[in-house]
């Protein structure tokens, strides 16, 4: 499945944004847009539907926070965590993982600005 990933920062400091409108306008099954920088981190919004590939981030932790719908964070070793709206999880650096959404989910991610969304 192709991923539609935009690492460019869409909004500057003090610029208001509507993450819901961005997600609503998304017409592809797997989309990710960097919203803004916060110090050395970046906030991204994603629309997930389907499976991302297994990967890890060697130097950065990654926060996933479900805004709408539900999705799974599958972890190496067989553990799978389901997140529903208003639930989140931090995946520590070095942990092999993938996200999986049987139906459409809208997700906020916060991570170091140096992270590669597709993994190291």
Predicted regions and their residues:
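A short, N-terminal "cap"/entry segment at the start of jelly-roll beta-barrel domains
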Residues: 1-44
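Conserved short histidine dyad/triad with adjacent acidic residue
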Residues: 28-29, 42-58
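A cytosolic small-molecule/anion-sensing beta-strand core signal
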Residues: 39, 67-68, 84-85, 103, ...
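Short acidic/polar mixed-charge low-complexity motifs
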Residues: 41-42, 71, 79, 95
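Short beta-strand segments in beta-sandwich/barrel cores
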Residues: 43, 52-54, 69-74, 88-89, ...
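Short, conserved beta-strand element in jelly-roll/cupin
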Residues: 47-48, 57-74, 110
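Short acidic-glycine-tyrosine-enriched beta hairpin
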Residues: 77-93
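Ligand-binding loop in jelly-roll beta-barrel domains
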Residues: 93-120
């Amino acid at each position: 499945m192709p991923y539609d990933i935009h690492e460019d920062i869409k909004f500057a400091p003090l610029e208001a944004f509507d993450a819901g409108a961005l997600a609503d306008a998304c017409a592809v099954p797997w989309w990710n847009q960097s919203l803004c920088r916060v110090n050395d981190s970046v906030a991204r919004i994603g629309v997930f539907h389907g499976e991302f590939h297994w990967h890890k981030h060697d130097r950065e932790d990654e926060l996933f926070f479900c805004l709408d719908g539900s999705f799974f964070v599958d972890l190496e070793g067989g553990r799978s965590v389901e997140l529903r709206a208003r639930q989140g999880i931090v995946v520590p650096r070095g942990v092999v993982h993938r996200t999986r959404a049987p139906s459409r989910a809208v997700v906020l991610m916060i991570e170091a600005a140096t992270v590669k969304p597709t993994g190291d």
